[in-house]
Regions:
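C-terminal flanking tails of non-heme Fe-dependent oxygenases
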Residues: 1-198
């Protein structure tokens, strides 16, 4: 996190102060061998909800959206880590970092992925940093609580939770952002900040 702060021209502690007991997750994702896979979609387009993701893939298949709204392959290199910017860094940076819109294409070979979803502390208020607001003349994003954002995005992503939401068994936190409202995907959908915030 300190490195991201330095890249923004800030002191490392401006972001590091929010990393004390983060609810980060390291996951193992398995994509089984699929003889019939031929450039079909595996995991749909999304951004990661946290600050950033470190990813160690074992085969090709990851695609990212570039600034023109085109899907491009991420070149696979054995043992190389991929860093995806997440929603929270986009907001903190006031858009200087853009959350990585990405998806996974089904490939014939068996594939494993080891993502570390790196979050900030659950109760952190994430909003554009004052220095970056001054640089751009205005805040491009409204504030959100990190834990509320993780919860809201999870509810809106998984079908069984969307069904519970529709039945009124659970509810979204106030100010929940729509899934896909950040990153290049959100920009290319034409969502304004006001539209993206409910």
């Amino acid at each position: 996190m300190g490195g991201f702060a330095i890249a923004l021209g800030l002191a490392p502690q401006q972001l590091l102060q929010h990393i004390n007991k983060p609810p980060s997750q390291l996951r193992l994702i398995h994509y089984p061998y699929n003889l019939n896979a031929e450039d079909t979609q595996g995991i749909g387009a999304h951004t990661d909800y946290e600050c950033f993701t470190l990813l160690l893939p074992t085969a090709p298949g990851l695609e990212v959206m570039n600034g023109k709204g085109e899907w491009i392959d991420v070149p696979f290199k054995e043992g190389a880590l991929i860093v995806n910017i997440g929603d929270m860094l986009e907001i903190w940076s006031n858009g200087e970092f853009v959350a990585t819109s990405h998806r996974v294409r089904k490939v014939k070979e068996e594939r494993y992925s080891f993502p570390l979803f790196f979050a900030c502390d659950y109760h952190t208020v994430v909003e554009p940093l004052p220095e970056l607001v001054a640089r751009h003349g205005q805040a491009r994003y409204s504030a959100l609580k990190a834990g509320d954002h993780l919860y809201a995005q999870t509810i809106q992503t998984f079908r069984y939770l969307r069904e519970r939401l529709a039945r009124g068994e659970i509810k979204l936190p106030d100010g929940a952002r729509e899934v896909g409202s950040l990153g290049q995907h959100g920009k290319n959908k034409g969502l304004s900040n006001e539209e993206a915030n409910r």
